[in-house]
A protein has these predicted regions:
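Hydrophobic alpha-helical segments at protein termini of multi-pass membrane proteins
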Residues: 1-209
Length: 209
């Protein structure tokens, strides 16, 4: 049995100490890191509870329950940040990415502790694939919210649409992982390629401007 709350305490404690020492400018980054790991912890409990209540098998829990729960949980601290602090548009995407990458980091650490780290190639691909998938979902949601929350009439509909897009991407990723075989490695490579393609496109647009 893996006591993930103990893992959370061990990982969050240094971040909290660093947040107190680094000053107000860097405080937001560390708080978003802790929030990302915290919602990952809560997502694990909620996934387990819903899987038990719905009597879902492993495939249903992975492809149907987990994407919805995890993407909604990642959205909660971001929506709180938007409602309470009303940040400028250029601060929304970094916040979403920070939450996503800390979520992925905590998830990978828990996976390593539970399943071992003896298969380097598999862990290597999983680390990059899972991290890129969560960051890609964060880019979709964060980049979209930076646009929609500047327009009052788009806030609710835009947020729901972006959440749906992130859930769909997450579900496809998990479904390919659950299928196993070559599809599993395709799913690990796909988010990395999409992030790389998006970055290259952004660089080209910047050079043209």
């Amino acid at each position: 049995m893996t006591y993930i709350e103990n893992i959370f305490l061990c990982m969050a404690s240094p971040l909290l100490v660093a947040a107190l020492c680094m000053g107000r400018r860097q405080l937001r980054f560390f708080l978003f890191c802790i929030a990302g790991m915290g919602v990952c912890l809560l997502s694990a409990y909620i996934n387990t509870f819903l899987a038990a209540v719905c009597q879902a098998d492993a495939l249903a829990a992975t492809a149907e329950i987990a994407p919805v729960v995890e993407e909604m949980m990642k959205l909660l601290p971001l929506v709180f940040y938007l409602l309470v602090f009303e940040p400028e548009g250029d601060k929304i995407k970094p916040a979403a990415i920070t939450i996503a990458l800390s979520f992925a980091t905590f998830e990978n650490v828990c996976y390593l502790i539970q399943n071992g780290a003896d298969r380097f190639s598999f862990i290597f691909f999983r680390g990059f694939g899972t991290g890129a998938m969560h960051v890609l979902c964060g880019l979709i949601v964060g980049g979209g919210l930076a646009y929609t929350w500047q327009r009052t009439w788009l806030k609710i509909a835009g947020t729901c649409g972006l959440l749906g897009a992130a859930i769909t991407l997450h579900a496809i990723y998990n479904l390919l992982i659950a299928h196993g075989g070559a599809a599993q490695y395709v799913s690990y490579a796909l988010p990395v390629l999409l992030v790389a393609a998006g970055k290259l496109s952004a660089l080209r647009l910047t050079r043209r401007e």
